[in-house]
């Protein structure tokens, strides 16, 4: 038995001579920690699990949903789910979708108004230009990757087998087609909504009617409002409205504070919804698998096409986008991706970029250190215009259908597919059944038959989820790149350009008490840290 070293009155071990003649003091607590290293590591594991509990629950929910769906669909008999029982089975997932969609409108409008009002017009223009450039370049890269993979893997080479098995369904279920010009005109119309209230739940879309004009049947375009939020129009209005509030100067500060407070309250709701997300995701994934009649046969027939899409999404999401992030920031991109695992899993479960937006904002701000005025300005724009996954999938599908129809694609047609996929993916968020309708636009642009889109619809439930994951990953990495740009700009300048730096005395008509926690106030504490010495109000001029 080893005797304890002598201790002083403060619990420190007696001083022992060191090799250089000095004295070393070791506390009893340090010795206990060294002796109980196993307990310390166990505490570290416990803290790590507690910190990443939501991430682990979300990933487990996806795996459990796949297992549950395969188990229920394979059991049959008494466990077979008809349409009425299936709707009850997926009800927890439906609740999650409804909760997330409830948050989208106030979150997008308030965050964009507050973000646009917090930046001077020059900084706003620079941030917007860099964001759009990043989104455009990555979408073009995704489109090129999709075309290259489809030409290399030849997913539509086995045309005879696929046509024999599902050719009848393809001829019976034609997807709605739209002229390319009308599609881009609809995009422009949705940018400028005629009614902001109806834009919250309706968007403009052109349909066609056959009319008898001078004895001939003519297809006439007819505009109508269809179900689906016009998020593109709301984004444009919110940005312009935020700039207008900034131009008002002191008169607009009260309204800016209102939108900032509204946005903070919305984020509190998001933090509550996040803990229900794993339950909803599990039942959404399981319900979609149960809904498919024969998953194994479907993969056997279209496995090469599915492989091409998923492989393209994996290459773009795990190699291309992280490489771009690393080249510009010199930071580990995979550490950044670990911080957004929860919204990525939510994107897979909900298959909606907009529904994932609240969780993505919270995670990039809290886990990856992106400033609020950047994340809440860039992420809503990215959810609207950045569709890397959709562009890649549409290019693969277009080449797949061309191979299926035994039509060759020359250089001009390939360039047309790339440009059309990049441009049409911008408006996909504002179009009901977005991905499939924009695919019809691409097929029309290169004179390919649209009747084979039914094959794409058969596996869209899986490919679309992969598209959504890639879309939201691109949004988050774009926000991280812009945060790095802002940090470098501020480090070069004594007066940061991208935040308000102009100070003025508080206005007498609108005194703001410090207890309100106003984001437009900066509080400074004295040397003792016991009282506020001065406060500045950041000008919105």
UniProtKB/Swiss-Prot annotation:
Residues 1-51, 117-130, 249-257, 329-333, 365-373, 483-541 are cytoplasmic. The chain crosses the membrane at residues 52-81, 95-116, 131-153, 225-248, 258-285, 307-328, 374-400, 461-482. GO terms for biological process: amino acid transport; erythrocyte differentiation; glutamine secretion; glutamine transport; L-aspartate import across plasma membrane; L-glutamine import across plasma membrane; neutral amino acid transport; protein homotrimerization. GO terms for cellular component: basal plasma membrane; centriolar satellite; ciliary basal body; extracellular exosome; melanosome; membrane; plasma membrane. Disulfide bonds: none annotated. One of its GO terms (molecular function) is virus receptor activity. Optimum pH is 7. The modification Phosphoserine is found at residues 493, 503, 535, 539. InterPro entries: DAACS, Na-dicarboxylate_symporter, Na-dicarboxylate_symporter_CS, Na:dicarbo_symporter_sf. The modification Phosphothreonine is found at residue 494. It is found in: Cell membrane; Melanosome. Glycans are attached at residues 163, 212. Na(+) 1 binds at residues 382, 386, 471, 475. It catalyses: L-glutamine(out) + L-serine(in) + Na(+)(out) = L-glutamine(in) + L-serine(out) + Na(+)(in); L-glutamine(in) + L-serine(out) + Na(+)(out) = L-glutamine(out) + L-serine(in) + Na(+)(in); L-threonine(in) + L-glutamine(out) + Na(+)(out) = L-threonine(out) + L-glutamine(in) + Na(+)(in); L-threonine(out) + L-glutamine(in) + Na(+)(out) = L-threonine(in) + L-glutamine(out) + Na(+)(in). Its main location: membrane. Na(+) 2 binds at residue 384. Sodium-coupled antiporter of neutral amino acids. In a tri-substrate transport cycle, exchanges neutral amino acids between the extracellular and intracellular compartments, coupled to the inward cotransport of at least one sodium ion. The preferred substrate is the essential amino acid L-glutamine, a precursor for biosynthesis of proteins, nucleotides and amine sugars as well as an alternative fuel for mitochondrial oxidative phosphorylation. Exchanges L-glutamine with other neutral amino acids such as L-serine, L-threonine and L-asparagine in a bidirectional way. Belongs to the dicarboxylate/amino acid:cation symporter (DAACS) (TC 2.A.23) family. SLC1A5 subfamily. This is Neutral amino acid transporter B(0).
């Amino acid at each position: 038995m080893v005797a304890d070293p002598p201790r002083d009155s403060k619990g420190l071990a007696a001083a022992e001579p060191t090799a250089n003649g000095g004295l070393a003091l070791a506390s009893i607590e340090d010795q206990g920690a060294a002796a109980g290293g196993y307990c310390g590591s166990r505490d570290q594991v416990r803290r790590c699990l507690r910190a990443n509990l939501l991430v682990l629950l979300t990933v487990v929910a996806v795996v459990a949903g796949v297992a549950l769906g395969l188990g229920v669909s394979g059991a049959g008999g008494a466990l077979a789910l008809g349409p009425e029982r299936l709707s009850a089975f997926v009800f927890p997932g439906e609740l999650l979708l409804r909760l997330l969609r409830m948050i989208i409108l106030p979150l997008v409008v308030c965050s964009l108004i507050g973000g646009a009002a917090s930046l001077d017009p020059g900084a706003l223009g620079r941030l917007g230009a860099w964001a759009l450039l990043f989104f455009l370049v990555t979408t073009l890269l995704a489109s090129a990757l999709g075309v290259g993979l489809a030409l290399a893997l030849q997913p539509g080479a086995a045309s005879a087998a696929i046509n024999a098995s599902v050719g009848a369904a393809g001829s019976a279920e034609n997807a709605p087609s739209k002229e390319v010009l009308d599609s881009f005109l609809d995009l422009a119309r949705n940018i400028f909504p005629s009614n902001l209230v109806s834009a919250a739940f309706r968007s403009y879309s052109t349909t066609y009617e056959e009319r008898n004009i001078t004895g001939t049947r003519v297809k006439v375009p007819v505009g109508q409002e269809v179900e689906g939020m016009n998020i593109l129009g709301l984004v444009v209005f919110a940005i312009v409205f935020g700039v207008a509030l900034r131009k008002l100067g002191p008169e607009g500060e009260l309204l800016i504070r209102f939108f900032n407070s509204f946005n903070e309250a919305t984020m509190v709701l998001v933090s509550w919804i996040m803990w229900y997300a794993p339950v909803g995701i599990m039942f959404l994934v399981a319900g979609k698998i149960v809904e498919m009649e024969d998953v194994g046969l479907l993969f056997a027939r279209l496995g090469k096409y599915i492989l091409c899409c998923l492989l393209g999404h994996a290459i773009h999401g795990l190699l291309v986008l992280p490489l771009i992030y690393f080249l510009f920031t010199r930071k580990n991109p995979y550490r950044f991706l670990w911080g957004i695992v929860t919204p990525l899993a939510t994107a897979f479960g909900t298959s909606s970029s907009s529904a994932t937006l609240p969780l993505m904002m919270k995670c990039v701000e809290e886990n990856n250190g992106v400033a609020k005025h950047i994340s809440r300005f860039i992420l809503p724009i990215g959810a609207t215009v950045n569709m890397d996954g959709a562009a890649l999938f549409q290019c693969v599908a277009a080449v797949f259908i061309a191979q299926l129809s035994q039509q060759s694609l020359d250089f001009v047609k390939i360039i047309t597919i790339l440009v059309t996929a990049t441009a049409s993916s911008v408006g996909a968020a504002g179009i009901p059944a977005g991905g499939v309708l924009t695919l019809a636009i691409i097929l029309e642009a290169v004179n390919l038959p649209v009747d084979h889109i039914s094959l794409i619809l058969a596996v869209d439930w899986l490919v679309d989820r992969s598209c959504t994951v890639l879309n939201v990953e691109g949004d988050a990495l774009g926000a991280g790149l812009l945060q790095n740009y802002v940090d470098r700009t501020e480090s070069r300048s004594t007066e940061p350009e991208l935040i308000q730096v102009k100070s003025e005395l508080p206005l007498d008509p609108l005194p703001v008490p410090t207890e309100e926690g106003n984001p437009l106030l900066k509080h400074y504490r004295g040397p003792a840290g016991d009282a506020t010495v001065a406060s500045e109000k950041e000008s919105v001029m």
